[in-house]
């Protein structure tokens, strides 16, 4: 019985050492690649650009009333559809976008409070500050572009 435990411990130790050697070998091989740093920088740059585009492209020009109204209606519709499908996270994201650019957010919040289940409405309330901050940043960027 002691022999089986000792054998298992030795086997586990050997497997761990082999795994560690495998990790070290491939990490060294990857790092010694002359293009590794360039590919890593390029990958990070593309991710950063994609993230910026995803955040900025969704918001309409806040000075164009027609674009804002169209965006508002699309976001409400998408939010309702996603909530009906059970995708609460994305549905709430769209509803928060609509609330953030709405001219009368308090009235819209009252309507949503009456129509949404309480947990979904709470999720909506927790996401509002982040979307308001994002829209504020987008307005600041637009003002900086004008100057």
Curated annotation (Swiss-Prot):
One of its GO terms (cellular component) is mitochondrial outer membrane translocase complex. InterPro entries: MAS20, MAS20_rcpt_metazoan, Tom20_dom_sf. It is found in: Mitochondrion outer membrane. GO terms for biological process: intracellular protein transport; protein targeting. Residues 27-147 are cytoplasmic. Forms part of the preprotein translocase complex of the outer mitochondrial membrane (TOM complex). Interacts with tom22. Keywords: Membrane, Mitochondrion, Mitochondrion outer membrane, Phosphoprotein, Protein transport, Transmembrane, Transmembrane helix, Transport. Residues 1-3 are mitochondrial intermembrane. The chain crosses the membrane at residues 4-26. The gene is tomm20. The lineage of its organism: Eukaryota, Metazoa, Chordata, Craniata, Vertebrata. It is a single-pass membrane protein. Central component of the receptor complex responsible for the recognition and translocation of cytosolically synthesized mitochondrial preproteins. Together with tom22 functions as the transit peptide receptor at the surface of the mitochondrion outer membrane and facilitates the movement of preproteins into the tom40 translocation pore. Belongs to the Tom20 family. Pfam families: MAS20. This is Mitochondrial import receptor subunit TOM20 homolog.
């Amino acid at each position: 019985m002691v022999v089986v435990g000792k054998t298992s411990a030795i086997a586990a130790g050997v497997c761990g050492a082999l795994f560690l050697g495998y990790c070290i070998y491939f990490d060294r091989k990857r790092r010694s690649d002359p293009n590794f740093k360039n590919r890593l920088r390029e990958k990070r740059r593309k991710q950063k650009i994609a993230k910026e585009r995803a955040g900025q492209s969704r918001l309409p020009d806040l000075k164009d009333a027609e674009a804002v109204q169209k965006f508002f209606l699309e976001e409400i519709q998408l939010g309702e559809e996603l909530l009906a499908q059970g995708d609460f996270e994305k549905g709430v994201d769209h509803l928060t976008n609509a609330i953030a650019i709405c001219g009368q957010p308090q009235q819209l919040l009252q309507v949503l409070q009456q129509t949404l289940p309480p947990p979904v409405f709470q999720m909506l309330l927790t996401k509002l500050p982040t979307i308001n901050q994002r829209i504020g940043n987008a307005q600041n960027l637009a003002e900086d572009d004008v100057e």
